[in-house]
Amino acid sequence: MMPHSGVLLDVTTPLLDGLQRIAQRQPRPQPFVDLGSLPWDDPGFSQHFLRTATRSQRHTQREMTCLEQWGLLRPGQRILDIACGGGRHSLAMARRGAVVTGIDLGPAAISAAQQRARKAGLQVEFVQGDVRSMDYEAAFDAVTFIFGCFTEMTRQDATEVLRRVSRSLRPGGMFVLDVYAPDFFAMLDGEQEWWVGRDFIAGRFPQLVLTEYFYYSDTKMYARRDFICDARTGAVHTFGVSGQSYALPELCDMLTEAGMQPAMVYGNWRGEDVTAESTMYLVLAAKAPETP
């Protein structure tokens, strides 16, 4: 028996067969070639991910406090929340009087966000769609991409998203983006985590999970793989994430090229400065105001 967090698995022949298949995996996958991205638009995956990936109200409160202090969250402010998920940020901003549109690729996430908005009596427009093809023009006072998947895109896609964000902002509008720094992914390189559970992104069943992390310093790309072995049948479900991280000057250059000028940069949501030890960047960028 293998215990983890109170979960016990019988060591059966199917489980051992599944582990053998995991042992034969490719040593180091090539990002965006051997691994793509998570199937966000798959209804089943969307439901499983939504159920297992949530953040605390404490995080949300801190983020909203920062947005208010920066003058970006005021009654009547038109805000686009990119990768809105189940509406954590969208609903919090709507409660503070903002006029919010949330966009996400996951059908279960959008459905859950709509239900939560109705239950709370809040008017929020939730759109199931791909941020890489969104088409708004000068429609928002602010755009947020918080706890999203900006780095889980190719550089080409990320450049296109920034262009579309800039187009969606009114002149003088603000963009808020948080991303993990390359050093965050570098620290994870080679890490492996084995754990036993009953509920993860492949569904609800007794399972043994291996999560692996990879980082490639020459390109600043990263990858994560999850092998989820069904303890009952030995079936192995594999999920992969590829990503492209950016040094801070590089990210600021991308924003500038898209038509947004970085105005403030922090090392976290506590408003601390970026240091050599920072594992994330929080960037506020402004679209140029209209010229007389």
Placement of each model-derived feature along the sequence:
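Conserved class I S-adenosyl-L-methionine
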Residues: 6-77
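Class I SAM-dependent methyltransferase "Motif I" SAM/SAH-binding loop
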Residues: 83-87
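Class I SAM-dependent methyltransferase SAM/SAH-binding core
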Residues: 88-133
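A short acidic, Gly/Pro-enriched loop at the edge of an enzyme's catalytic core
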Residues: 132-142
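A short glycine-rich, Lys/Arg-flanked "PGG" loop and its adjoining helix->strand segment in the class I
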Residues: 159-171
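Conserved beta-strand signature within the Rossmann-like core of class I S-adenosyl-L-methionine
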Residues: 172-179
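SAM-dependent methyltransferase
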Residues: 179-252
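C-terminal lobe and adjacent flexible extensions of AdoMet/dcAdoMet transferase-like proteins
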Residues: 242-292
